[in-house]
Amino acid sequence: CACLVGSEMCIRDRDMGVPAATEFLDTITPQYIADLITWGAIGARTTESQVHRELASGLSMPVGFKNGTSGSLQIAVDAIVSSSCPHCFLSVTKQGVSAIVSTTGNKSCHLILRGSSLGPNFDEEHVKEAVAALQKSGINNRIMIDCSHGNSCKDYRKQPAVAANIAEQISNGSDQVVAVMIESNIVEGAQPLSSDLVYGKSITDQCIGWETTEEVLETLAAAVRRRRAKRQEA
């Protein structure tokens, strides 16, 4: 089954020392794979969903909530606040038996800026606006930025430019941005699902290729080194 295949993949990643992350889409699957996941995401279209907020409240990992597709930050802020509190919801036990699950709340949830139908929101001005909204609600003000989706205007080739802007913010001393999300694969682009697939090429969203990914990661790493050097000088 799909859960078994996913678990086997996560175990292989773990054995190589690579932490696994995923987007959680329902309240059942996590019971089978959550112990193998290091970080989780709730997508823009489900951030407003009460059951996903309840789910996040019981996950033993940091969970990122994306801003809404309309650009609304408040939807994600409300989700983070809600998920920090205890909840009860219908799910299954680890043995697959239907049960009422009780949670203690997840204080490690955070915001993901992913852009919107109105345009990108990765620049310094939008980051400051997001931090202010998070601080006003008294919650974690550290932010992840999605280099794809609305922030790339759905053009995967623009992801390096988005990452370069984020790197500049980091180089200038910003510590609000703690992570980025990149749609990346071995081979750039995407392909339709067929019987003749190219290994390492996405069958969903278009991705940057591995060489470009390495360049983006080095740009971000260099920015972190510059920020660290500035702090040591101060």
Residue ranges of model-derived segments:
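Single conserved hydrophobic/aromatic residue that forms the stacking wall/gate
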Residues: 1-6, 10-11
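Glycine-rich tight-turn/loop motif centered on a GG-T
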Residues: 7, 34-48, 80-89, 106, ...
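Catalytic-site microenvironment of enzymes
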Residues: 8, 33-37, 52, 132-136
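A structural motif corresponding to the C-terminal end of an alpha-helix
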Residues: 12-18, 58-59, 106, 133-140, ...
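Hydrophobic faces of well-ordered beta-strands that scaffold small-molecule active sites
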Residues: 20-23, 63-65, 109-113, 141-146, ...
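Loop-centered beta-sheet repeat module
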Residues: 41-93
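Conserved mixed alpha/beta catalytic, RNA-binding, or beta-rich assembly cores of soluble enzyme
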Residues: 78-165
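Catalytic-face loop-and-helix region of soluble metabolic enzyme cores
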Residues: 116, 144-203, 207-211, 215, ...
